[in-house]
């Protein structure tokens, strides 16, 4: 009887161990390589009087534009901004196709005004970026949000959740 109990508990331990290990998520090698390539590309960006912007459109709910970082800096340092479009309209607004450029990457020319703007849907304050001009870098840039390469993170990201780049 003792031997059967031992075999039963041993089998249960093996099953639970395999079950728990199957729940561990590893990043596919292609995505990992894309992230390494993106980090190398960022490190190679020449310094200058410009910024890199990643359009982050969350439906018609939120009124921020996207993430902006300095050249050569990782996306984890980027700031979520509201655009001041008095001098230049945002790319999607110029085309009257709001949000059509979601997840696009741009070279932005302009500056931070030093002002913060209240965005009521998120109940947050965001820095104001005064856009002077822009250049499209990519319509399909490397992923910067966990939800772009993790099914588990994508499932956990709700419509009203604001992601932060990694």
Model-inferred region functions:
Residues 2-12:
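Bacterial N-terminal signal peptides that target proteins for export
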Residues 1-2, 25:
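N-terminal hydrophobic targeting signals that begin at the initiator methionine
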Residues 20-23:
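C-terminal motif of bacterial Sec signal peptides marking the signal peptidase cleavage site
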Residues 26-166:
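OB-fold and OB-like single-stranded nucleic-acid-recognition modules
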């Amino acid at each position: 009887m003792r031997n059967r109990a031992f075999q039963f508990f041993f089998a249960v331990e093996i099953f639970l161990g395999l079950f728990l290990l199957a729940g561990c998520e590893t990043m596919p090698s292609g995505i990992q390589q894309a992230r390494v390539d993106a980090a190398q590309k960022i490190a190679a960006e020449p310094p200058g009087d410009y910024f890199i912007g990643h359009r982050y459109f969350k439906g018609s709910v939120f009124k921020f534009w996207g993430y902006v970082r300095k050249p050569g800096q990782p996306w984890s340092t980027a700031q979520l901004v509201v655009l001041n479009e008095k001098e230049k309209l945002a790319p999607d607004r110029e085309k009257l196709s709001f949000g059509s450029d979601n997840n696009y990457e741009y070279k932005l020319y302009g500056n931070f005004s030093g002002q913060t703007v209240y965005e009521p849907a998120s109940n947050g304050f965001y820095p104001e970026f005064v856009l002077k001009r822009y250049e499209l870098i990519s319509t399909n840039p490397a992923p910067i949000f966990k939800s772009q390469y993790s099914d588990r993170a994508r499932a956990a990201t709700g419509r009203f959740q604001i992601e932060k780049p990694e």
